[in-house]
Curated annotation (Swiss-Prot):
Protein's recorded name: N-acetylmuramic acid 6-phosphate etherase
Top EC category: lyase
PANTHER family listed in its UniProt record: GLUCOKINASE REGULATORY PROTEIN
PROSITE patterns linked: GCKR, SIS
Source organism per UniProt: Thermobifida fusca (strain YX)
Biological or metabolic pathway of the protein: Amino-sugar metabolism; N-acetylmuramate degradation
Amino acid sequence: MHTAPVEIVRAPTEARNSSTKDIDLLPTADILRLINAEDATVPRAVAEVLPELAKAVDLGVSVLRHGGRIHYFGAGTSGRLATMDAAELPPTFGIARDRVVAHHAGGPSALIHACEGIEDDFSSGRADAATVTSADLAIGLTASGRTPYVAGALDRAREAGARTVLVTADPHSALAADVDVHIGVATGAEVIAGSTRMKAGTAQKLILNAFSTAVMVRLGYTYSNLMVGVVATNAKLRGRMVTILTEATGLSEEDCAEALHRADGDTRIALVCLLTGVDVPTAAHALHAAHGSVRAALRELART
């Protein structure tokens, strides 16, 4: 009889949590309080790795500024979280969809139906990283810090000359030695041993939120804390962008709506026009020269 291979995983996320050993004996309210108390430890753990996260952000900014792309690689929960983050960036900031891309072990079908075996395929990770170039940044996400799919993707990315980042829930991951930046969050044992969709997944979501948002802010996709990178293509978006323009300028909704119309729905062009009084072509030229940054365009126009 054929025996399937067995590998004992010693990752911190696989350990039993001494605080939750009696969870199956508790009433609902106490179960929820216990889960909530464990969840509350995650932001503190993420705070400990902010210096490493800052290095990853700076790499992402440099790569996108010079025409490269950011690639996320993950399996299971990690891949789903990465896919969600990449999908949200175009509607939130207006960045082109091919600039930040997610690769999930097993492809699109695995986003809905778990395909646990594919995460063990090193060669599949390498194959999915075939489009990574020396101009790019590859970010691998693996709670255990040892997923072969992610290891394969980062291995192929390194061969291509790309910069590499590893996000794990194991500060001592064996894969860390081969990447430029390791963000190892010490989330510890899960509420349910090995269920990394919980604290480890929460940490990954916080890191992805912070990483992509900081990169977009650094690249000028916001003005102050306002989303100005979105092109208003329907009535709902036009209404939202008019509200943003009134917040940014203090002008009336009518003036902002007219400026947005003249700018063909481009919020950044409309904002530059409203703040400086220049026409649409001048605002568009200034933004192009400033790589889309409203503040940089305003500084340049102030000099002329």
